[in-house]
């Protein structure tokens, strides 16, 4: 049963706060102190029954007993609730249900300091020692409390069992005051008002005061006020007597704070007004942001010494710290103004960069540009550039403490905005007023820092744009230079000729041109002694190039200059006037073979020797082919230099000669006579046989077949003579 109807906090909310305060994300067994204090206020305000609060903490111990870090943080939360939860919660916590579970199950089973496994595990041993230290501290705190004596009984049992309790750091300072936390009192039931003593009826209803627990009528319990000392942060119903006590206590506290803040000034109601304080803060901010033009900045005035109060009240520690901080800040400001140069005290003019002014005449109407001689233009050195930017004052950023103050003020204002009950008591919150004054003083500094950051961003953005433009121009200039360099690139001839420039990529090969392989000049042959004409543009029409086993090289005209190449019509005329011979068969085994008639006719018309000539051997009339006497060396001029129009090819070794193929025998008009002379007819053989046997007299005798020649015997056709073809002379 909850004490206050309409403001009951569910148990799920309490359990979620407990889980959040002892979260796994918090390392080293620590807890979130802010949420833990909210839990203690929730327990102390009696919004949730104390037994249910104890069972929620016990449930968290059950779920985290296997993790030493989470168990340590949960035990720290339980200890904080013991010191701030109120006496009604201590009664439930020191009951047999919670203490036996903590000692008999968690400590003796999982974290027993006598167990060897726990002793070897350092983390578990620390948790066991921490449980023993908590039981010892609670025993000292609950001393002479009859309702809390079960903790002391468990402590003596553990001592009798031989457990050693660690020495507590604050054991000698612990007393009953550690658990003296105010809690809402129990309600008193009565049939009449405790102030006017009017009996309660249907029209005069009964109300309880949350501060004292008494029963009052509507007339004497119409005030609402937060009870911070009892852990109640929202305004609740109080009686007239309790309201006057709370009001007098708050007024004394406010007057004490005002006397400490302004002890030399007389207390006046106008000075306490919030509007007056806001006006002073605005004037102070305007005075700080104002920049003098020609006047010297006056040094800050030293703060007047604090006059001791005649009442003899001791100064608060926070006020002493504030006075020390103000004195330290005054000394720093005075030291800064002494070190500030006189030139910087005059009107500050924003420096203008001269780095990009004289690159291009952007503004020729500028008088500084017209009056200045280009030869006398000052050069922008890095030192001068650094000196100009060194004169610019540096804006101080917000410190970490100032940022925390701003964030705290924002958080408090958001809480007040969401809670309408706190808005009525905002005038009585002295801490919030003091924090508001500090935030107002930080506003000019924050504006300066923001303006400096924006200017720095714009400057960096402008420099980035300039760098991008310059990089693009440089890339375009470099690309143009590279294209020009590649266009003028030349390749020298391997035979000492003039350089040949490449204009564009290699043209595609549209014809299959046979180019003889160059032969090293060191290789010589006795049978190649004549210098034949130069081979140029020999191609086989209608025949694809056959693989020869060697690398294919480009044609002659592919790597030559355009000025050295004759037109296509001139090339055809030169070919018809000066026909050239194909390459030797030793270089190209597979070549196009012309018919005998075409070869003979071409040789007779041009007066050139045939491709092959036959010579008579000593063994008989057998004709064997004879290779043409042509050199495979590049053609040379009269002065011994190589021809420039010769193909530019690397100097490879000559390939090995292949098996020559015999050309077809020449056929003339007397071929039938030759065949008849060499191979006589059957009639001639019969007549010759008859003449041989009968001497030409016996014609009726049957002729016999000629005898076949035996293997190894010399041929009997030596008398037969073949008609030799006369070899024409070679034109040199």
Curated annotation (Swiss-Prot):
Annotated Zn(2+) 1 binding lies at 193, 196, 217, 220
Where in this chain does the record put each VHS domain? 23-166
Q: Where is the composition biased (Polar residues)?
A: 491-513, 542-579, 592-607, 629-651, 683-695
Zinc finger (FYVE-type) stretch: 187-247
Q: Name one GO cellular component term.
A: ESCRT-0 complex
Example GO molecular function: phosphatidylinositol-3-phosphate binding
**Which UniProt keywords are listed?**
Endosome, Membrane, Metal-binding, Repeat, Zinc, Zinc-finger
InterPro entries, per the entry:
ENTH_VHS (IPR008942), HGS/VPS27 (IPR017073), UIM_dom (IPR003903), VHS_dom (IPR002014), Vps27_GAT-like (IPR049425), Znf_FYVE (IPR000306), Znf_FYVE-rel (IPR017455), Znf_FYVE_PHD (IPR011011)
| Membrane topology term | Peripheral membrane protein
Q: Pfam families this protein is in?
A: FYVE, UIM, VHS, Vps27_GAT-like
* Compositionally biased tracts (Low complexity): 364-379, 524-541
Which range is the signal sequence, renumbered to this chain?
none
Coarse class of the protein's main subcellular location: membrane
Basic and acidic residues composition-biased segments: 616-627, 717-726
Q: Where is the composition biased (Pro residues)?
A: 652-663
Presence of keyword Zinc-finger? yes
The UniProt record lists the UIM domain at 273-292, 314-333
Oxidoreductase in keyword set: no
Localization terms from the record = Endosome membrane
Oligomer and partners: Component of the ESCRT-0 complex composed of HSE1 and VPS27.
User: What is the recorded function of this protein according to its Swiss-Prot or TrEMBL entry?
Assistant: Component of the ESCRT-0 complex which is the sorting receptor for ubiquitinated cargo proteins at the multivesicular body (MVB) and recruits ESCRT-I to the MVB outer membrane.
**Domain comment quoted from the record:** The FYVE domain is involved in the binding to phosphatidylinositol 3-phosphate (PtdIns(3)P) which is required for the association to endosomal membranes. Both IUM domains are necessary for efficient binding to ubiquitin.
Family to which the UniProt record says this protein belongs:
Belongs to the VPS27 family.
Q: What is this protein called?
A: Vacuolar protein sorting-associated protein 27
Which species? Debaryomyces hansenii (strain ATCC 36239 / CBS 767 / BCRC 21394 / JCM 1990 / NBRC 0083 / IGC 2968)
Q: Which gene encodes it?
A: VPS27
């Amino acid at each position: 049963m909850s004490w206050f109807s309409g403001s009951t906090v569910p148990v799920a909310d309490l359990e979620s706060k407990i889980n959040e305060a002892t979260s796994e994300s918090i390392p080293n067994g620590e807890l979130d102190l802010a949420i833990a204090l909210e839990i203690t206020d929730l327990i102390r305000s009696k919004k949730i029954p104390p037994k249910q609060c104890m069972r929620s903490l016990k449930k968290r111990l059950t779920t985290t007993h296997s993790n030493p870090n989470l168990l340590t943080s949960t035990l720290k939360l339980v200890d904080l609730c013991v010191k701030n939860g109120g006496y009604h919660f201590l009664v439930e916590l020191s009951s047999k249900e919670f203490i036996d579970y903590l000692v008999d199950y968690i400590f003796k089973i999982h974290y027993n300091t006598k167990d060897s496994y726990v002793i070897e595990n350092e983390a578990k041993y620390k948790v066991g020692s921490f449980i023993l230290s908590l039981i010892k501290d609670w025993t000292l705190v609950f001393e002479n409390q009859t309702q809390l004596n079960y903790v002391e009984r468990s402590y003596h049992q553990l001592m009798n069992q031989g457990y050693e309790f660690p020495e507590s750091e604050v054991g000698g300072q612990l007393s009953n005051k550690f658990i003296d936390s105010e809690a809402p009192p129990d309600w008193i039931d009565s049939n009449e008002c405790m102030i006017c003593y009017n009996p309660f009826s249907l029209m005069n209803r009964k109300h309880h005061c949350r501060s004292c627990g008494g029963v009052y009528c509507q007339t004497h319990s119409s005030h609402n006020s937060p009870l911070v000392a009892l852990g109640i942060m929202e305004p609740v119903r109080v009686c007239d007597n309790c309201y006057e006590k709370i009001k007098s206590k708050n007024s004394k506290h406010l007057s004490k704070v005002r006397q400490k803040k302004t002890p030399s000034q007389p207390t006046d109601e106008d000075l306490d007004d919030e509007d007056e304080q806001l006006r002073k803060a605005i004037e102070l901010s305007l005075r700080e942001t104002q920049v003098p033009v020609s006047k010297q900045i006056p040094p800050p005035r030293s703060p007047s010494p604090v006059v001791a109060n005649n009442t003899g009240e001791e100064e608060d520690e926070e006020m002493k710290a504030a006075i020390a901080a103000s004195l330290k800040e005054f000394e720093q400001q005075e030291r800064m103004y002494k070190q500030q140069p006189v030139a910087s005290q005059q009107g500050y003019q924003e420096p203008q960069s001269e780095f990009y002014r004289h690159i291009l005449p952007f503004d020729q109407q500028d008088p500084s540009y017209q009056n200045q001689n280009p030869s006398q233009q000052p050069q922008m050195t890095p030192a001068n550039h650094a000196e100009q930017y060194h004169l610019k004052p540096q804006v101080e950023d917000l410190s970490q403490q100032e940022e925390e103050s701003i964030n705290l003020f924002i958080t408090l204002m958001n809480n007040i905005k969401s809670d309408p009950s706190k808005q009525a008591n905002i005038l009585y919150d002295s801490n919030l007023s003091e924090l508001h004054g500090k935030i107002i003083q930080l506003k000019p500094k924050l504006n300066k820092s923001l303006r400096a950051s924006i200017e720095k961003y714009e400057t960096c953005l402008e420099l980035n744009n300039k760098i991008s433009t310059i990089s693009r121009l440089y890339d375009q200039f470099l690309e143009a230079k590279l294209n020009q360099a590649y266009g003028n690139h030349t390749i020298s001839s391997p035979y000492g000729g003039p350089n040949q420039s490449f204009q564009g990529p290699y043209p595609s090969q549209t014809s299959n041109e046979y180019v003889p392989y160059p032969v090293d000049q060191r290789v010589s042959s006795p049978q190649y002694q004549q210098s034949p004409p130069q081979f140029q543009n020999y191609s086989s029409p209608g025949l694809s190039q056959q693989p020869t086993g060697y690398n294919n090289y480009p044609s002659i005209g592919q790597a030559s200059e355009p000025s050295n190449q004759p037109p296509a019509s001139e090339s055809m005329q030169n070919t018809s006037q000066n026909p050239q011979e194909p390459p030797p068969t030793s270089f190209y085994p597979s070549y196009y073979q012309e018919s005998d008639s075409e070869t003979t006719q071409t040789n007779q018309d041009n007066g050139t020797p045939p491709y092959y000539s036959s010579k008579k051997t000593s063994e008989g009339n057998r004709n064997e082919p004879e290779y043409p006497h042509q050199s495979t060396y590049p053609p040379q001029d009269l002065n011994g230099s190589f021809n420039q129009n010769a193909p530019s090819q690397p100097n490879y070794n000559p390939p090995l000669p292949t098996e020559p193929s015999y050309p077809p025998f020449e056929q003339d008009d007397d071929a039938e006579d030759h065949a008849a002379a060499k191979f006589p007819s059957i009639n001639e053989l019969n007549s010759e046989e008859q003449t041989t046997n009968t001497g030409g007299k016996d014609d009726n005798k049957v002729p016999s077949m000629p005898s076949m020649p035996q293997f190894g015997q010399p041929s009997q056709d030596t008398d037969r003579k073949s008609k030799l073809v006369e070899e024409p002379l070679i034109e040199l």
